[in-house]
């Protein structure tokens, strides 16, 4: 089968698992709050349950070293995500949504970890390694699609139940279409089975930085719709910010995927992406539409592009260990994400808003960029010493 078909199917799988299964919670939060199912603090805890599940799923995916294990997690996670989204239509109240979001987090992590490694193998075997990065447009296209669906449903006066049902049916149709087209884990293609040796020293600062990114990006990514709804009460303009976030994120991934490769370019782009994202988080604090618009552009653009850059940087640092490193990086990212909604819940409880949490999120992104900049300089020095 054509590698292009495999990559497109993988992109749509991430559309389902991440864009629908994971991030559809964001446009639903204003509904859940307006319907009296939860308050802002409860919404933060529901999001935290989702990210705790993501952490559990990522850690579990580290154990999927055999093709049969990876196969079960990929397809089990994909179909579980569909079922969970449909089941959310009948859920009401805090605890049912906590349980479902936790399960959705586990399922989405399984799909992301396994499929990221498989897509990289497909692209490398086809002699077109840059193709693998395009699968990261899947989550952002899912965000765009669910955001537009949410806008249409809100204009029609529908609540959270109808939205969950539409998201679930969309995921079901796509999963039926792509199931036979997805790459299958195979014994000889499983990079995790090849001897990789110890991880290079440069990998660990990348892991720490990516964990900080999890803290930094997740608060605006989770609460953007709620922040817009709070500023534009009853206006349809509030529903435009989330699909716009998805569109900008898609453009960011395409820009990174199509950039001209060069020595050290991945590190430079990563530092720039993280610092732009920090500005975007701070911009969410500006009053009115201007602040949210800047937040959409500068948080959305680097949103998935930074994830792609981290994965590319990890492959550059440790090519043979890439499959195992994807799982560890995703676990670190998930741990950071878990801290984000908890910070948001504490911020809401003690200050009545998200301002303190957003300031801490921006600080985490600035620190992550600084760590990557320092690591780049150290790698340059080591390279000069080795040549000398």
Regions found by a protein language model. Name each.
Residues 94, 125-182:
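Helix-loop-helix hairpin linking two adjacent transmembrane segments in secondary transporters
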Residues 317-352:
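A late C-terminal transmembrane helix in Major Facilitator Superfamily
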Residues 79-92, 275-287:
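C-terminal ends and interior cores of transmembrane alpha-helices
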Residues 100-138:
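Cytoplasmic helix-loop-helix junction between adjacent transmembrane helices
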Residues 26, 203-243:
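Extracytoplasmic gate region of multi-pass secondary transporters
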Residues 95-104, 290-298:
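Paired small-residue
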Residues 266-310:
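C-terminal transmembrane helical hairpin of 12-TM major facilitator-type secondary transporters
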Residues 57-70, 252-265, 348:
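Helix-to-loop junctions at the C-terminal end of transmembrane segments
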